[in-house]
Amino acid sequence: MSAYLTPGQIKSALANTPQITFEVTDACNLRCEYCAYGKLYSDYDKREDRMLPTETAKRFIDYMAALWASPDNHSVNNNLYVGFYGGEPLLNTPFIKEIVGYLKAGGHAKRFAYNMTTNAMLLDRHMDFLVEHNFSLLISLDGNTENDSYRIKADGKPSFEQVVKNVDMLHAAYPEYFAKKVNFNAVLHNRNSVDGIRGFIKERYGKTPRIGDINDSGIREDMKEEFKRMYRNSYESLLQNENYDEIEKEMFLSSPTYHSATIFLMQNSPFKYENYNELLFGKNENKTFCPTGTCIPFSRKVFVTVNGKILPCERIGHQYSVGHVDANGVMLDFEAIADKYNTYYSCLEKKCRLCKNQRTCIQCMFYLNGLENGKCECNGFMDEKQFERYRQTQLAFFVRHPDAYSEIMKNVIYK
């Protein structure tokens, strides 16, 4: 079996990870019908209204602190983002307050910044604390009343009025904070559109929202028809608008077309450099090929679930945990993690070597069916004809937006 990743690479990635995210609770005060932890899906731990114990989180922070003090850490004094995730994280505000205090008192050689994704149902009660600690907030809102109608309370009633009331309150009380630190996230489905979401949030709050598709990984067999009924593709929704050029430019990287063109450019341009060493001394043409576009574990973040599972990301199924933290400490075996990843990569390499899109691939292998039994197939595979169509689509984008090349190359940091 080829050694695509080594234990040392993974340990170094964790020591220098730019973000730690805690699933502070699996409880939620909404029952969104497309929720990744809801009726459509099967790849998550059972939701039991649990709260992550502060001692568990502190134990993990102490483990990370030892790595920060080790030779593996080459990002001393860099920003480290600490995220609070749910469920609805504001249901466990005591945890958040205690962990923020613990980090501030720790004397670590890191600059901590805090972020949170929230449904805003409890924002009116806790906004002062969030503003005081300069939290970056990502508020979930799918547009107007009809657009937002899949986001319902436990009693089946709409959440829209209460959410908008609380967001309006934050906007009025802290306008400067709101302008700098608050953004919106929307999910596209059969009751809204890219233009409708953008129009509502732009008009009411002066913000351009991030818009994502409903998660298409881990769908239960008996819910596939329901998923298909609700699902809409953001790229297709964007192209259906008469003024889609204007929307594209305004959304920039939040636009699926800009995002796709950016990845294509960053992976193919001879003028893109990973660091100053590449710029000054040339690129390493002998870098190890890793199948798919899957991140090196912990290179972007580390995620701790409410049950103490450790994952490289909150977006993948909980069956792919790579470690655990509990009363006995942190259990992370870097050699075992490397072996697991290398086994997956070995399964995928033959197919990836034949794919003409391997240089620009962003396919996460954890979204592929059959990964665990060694029979995975990649939905993103491209033969020569498919890749040429993809290439022509990206080049046509730059013909349509001649200023986009300069904008992307000057303003985008791609990792």
Where are these regions (language model features)?
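Conserved alpha-helical substructure of the radical SAM core
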Residues: 3-126
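Hydrophobic faces of well-ordered beta-strands that scaffold small-molecule active sites
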Residues: 20, 82, 114-116, 137-139, ...
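Cysteine-centered iron-sulfur cluster-binding motifs in ferredoxin-type domains/subunits
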Residues: 24-31, 298, 352-354, 358-359
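Conserved radical SAM core fold
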Residues: 41-42, 89-91, 120-124, 136-157, ...
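Glycine-enriched alpha-helix->loop->beta-strand junction motifs that scaffold or abut catalytic
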Residues: 131-137, 205-207
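Radical SAM enzyme [4Fe-4S]-AdoMet core and its adjacent flexible, acidic
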Residues: 150-164, 168-293, 297, 307
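Flexible mid-to-C-terminal extensions adjoining Fe-S/redox cofactors in radical SAM and related proteins
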Residues: 292, 309-310, 315-415
